[in-house]
């Protein structure tokens, strides 16, 4: 089937729209599908996503599309950018509409709710082994990407030619640098764990602790990410790159991060539900915490920071209790396998 678009993006939230804007600005005809027809009509009328990225004009090559069948028929390249808790559901909806030559990449950051499975496992369960798969991950705030500010990300997949095609599609000399990576597993994990650590950094700052504590959490958070990654077969070196250290530093230190702001609100004494309402958008780290905690427990991987965030979010603990517990841990060498 002939392409009428270079790529179709599923998910018209802030990040999906930002990626679609970047692709269209790079000269690629891009279809952007969203589950809410009214939202898509607003995009068509306003030529902007005023709900999530106000004030940023959609390029002419970006085409909002409310019909999923039309969107998936337009291109064999499909970029999924939806919250992790609906990732499987969207793939189920897309499955009967995919082309024979479809190739699936996602920028969703997270694991499967309840099970803690990687999204590649979810994709394989829904789609089988028929389609090439890839993941896009790295330190990106949607607003900056949409505004054309310099950004760098990584992409890895099951098919080398698909990975290289994605690099060519996404890379832009003046706005987006794309690095190919061969660690499909590692790139998926980094995007989930960094959200958990960002909540912890936000809680620390909300309590009133300083830069020393925040930096310690980032550093030890990287240790936790690497430890869990190695347990599932990822490469430790991946977590020193864009999808590990890069995403971790960005999300833990800048208030554009919803996860960091969520943690800040908790640290200042707000309850979990109250803090979520204040953010006003999906806080991926809330679900990611349970997902990562579940995976770590299943594998027997020690992740003290993640465990304390889990206790605050799901077991009624407080940020002060979490800090006290972490500080009271047994003294150990920095280079020991466990903290």
Swiss-Prot record:
Any one of the GO BP annotations: carbohydrate metabolic process
E.C. number(s) listed in UniProt: 1.1.1.94
Residues noted as binding NADPH in the record, renumbered to the chain: 14-15, 35, 109, 142, 258, 282, 284
GO MF annotations in UniProt: glycerol-3-phosphate dehydrogenase [NAD(P)+] activity; NAD binding
Primary residence: cytoplasm
Residues annotated as the enzyme's active site: 194
PROSITE patterns: NAD_G3PDH
Keywords assigned: Cytoplasm, Lipid biosynthesis, Lipid metabolism, NAD, NADP, Nucleotide-binding, Oxidoreductase, Phospholipid biosynthesis, Phospholipid metabolism
Metabolic or biological pathway: Membrane lipid metabolism; glycerophospholipid metabolism
Organism domain of life: Bacteria
Catalytic activity: sn-glycerol 3-phosphate + NAD(+) = dihydroxyacetone phosphate + NADH + H(+); sn-glycerol 3-phosphate + NADP(+) = dihydroxyacetone phosphate + NADPH + H(+)
GO terms under cellular component: cytosol
Classification via InterPro entries: 6-PGluconate_DH-like_C_sf (IPR008927), 6PGD_dom2 (IPR013328), G3P_DH_NAD-dep (IPR006168), G3P_DH_NAD-dep_C (IPR006109), G3P_DH_NAD-dep_N (IPR011128), NAD(P)-bd_dom_sf (IPR036291)
Alphabetical list of Gene3D superfamilies matching this protein: N-(1-d-carboxylethyl)-l-norvaline Dehydrogenase, domain 2, NAD(P)-binding Rossmann-like Domain
Pfam families the UniProt entry points to: NAD_Gly3P_dh_C (PF07479), NAD_Gly3P_dh_N (PF01210)
Compartments it resides in: Cytoplasm
UniProt-annotated binding residues for sn-glycerol 3-phosphate: 109, 138, 140, 194, 247, 257-259
PANTHER family for the chain: GLYCEROL-3-PHOSPHATE DEHYDROGENASE (PTHR11728), GLYCEROL-3-PHOSPHATE DEHYDROGENASE [NAD(+)] 2, CHLOROPLASTIC (PTHR11728:SF1)
Function of the molecule: Catalyzes the reduction of the glycolytic intermediate dihydroxyacetone phosphate (DHAP) to sn-glycerol 3-phosphate (G3P), the key precursor for phospholipid synthesis.
Family: Belongs to the NAD-dependent glycerol-3-phosphate dehydrogenase family.
Alphabetized NCBIfam families for the sequence: PRK00094.1-1, PRK00094.1-2, PRK00094.1-4
The protein's name in its UniProt record: Glycerol-3-phosphate dehydrogenase [NAD(P)+]
Record gene name: gpsA
């Amino acid at each position: 089937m002939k392409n009428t678009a270079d790529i179709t993006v599923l998910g018209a939230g802030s990040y999906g729209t930002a990626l679609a804007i970047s692709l269209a600005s790079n000269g690629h005809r891009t279809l952007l599908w969203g589950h809410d027809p009214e939202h898509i009509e607003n995009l068509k009328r306003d030529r902007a996503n005023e709900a999530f990225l106000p004030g940023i004009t959609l390029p002419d090559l970006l085409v909002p599309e409310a019909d999923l069948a039309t969107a998936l028929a337009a291109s064999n390249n499909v970029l999924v950018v939806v919250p992790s808790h609906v990732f499987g559901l969207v793939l189920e909806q897309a499955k009967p509409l995919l082309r024979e030559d479809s190739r699936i990449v996602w920028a969703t950051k997270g694991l499967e709710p309840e099970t803690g499975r990687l999204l590649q496992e979810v994709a394989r369960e829904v789609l089988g082994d028929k389609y090439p798969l890839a993941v896009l991950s790295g330190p990106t705030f949607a607003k900056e990407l949409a505004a054309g500010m310099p950004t760098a990300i990584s992409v890895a997949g099951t098919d080398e030619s698909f990975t290289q095609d994605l690099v060519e599609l996404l890379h832009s000399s003046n706005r987006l640098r794309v690095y190919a990576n061969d660690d499909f597993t590692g790139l998926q994990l980094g995007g989930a764990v960094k959200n958990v650590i960002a909540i912890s950094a936000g809680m620390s700052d909300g309590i009133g602790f300083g830069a020393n504590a925040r930096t310690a959490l980032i550093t030890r958070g990287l240790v936790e990410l690497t430890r869990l990654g190695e347990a599932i077969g990822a490469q430790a070196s991946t977590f020193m790159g864009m999808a590990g250290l890069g995403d971790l530093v960005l999300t833990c230190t800048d208030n554009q991060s919803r996860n960091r702001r969520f943690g800040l609100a908790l640290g200042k004494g707000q309850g979990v539900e109250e803090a979520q309402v204040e953010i006003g958008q999906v806080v991926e780290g809330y679900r990611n915490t349970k997902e990562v905690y579940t995976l770590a427990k299943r594998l027997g991987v020690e992740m003290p920071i993640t465990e304390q965030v889990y206790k605050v979010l799901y077991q009624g603990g407080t940020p002060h209790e979490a800090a006290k517990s972490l500080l009271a841990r047994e003294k150990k060498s920095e280079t020991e396998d466990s903290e």
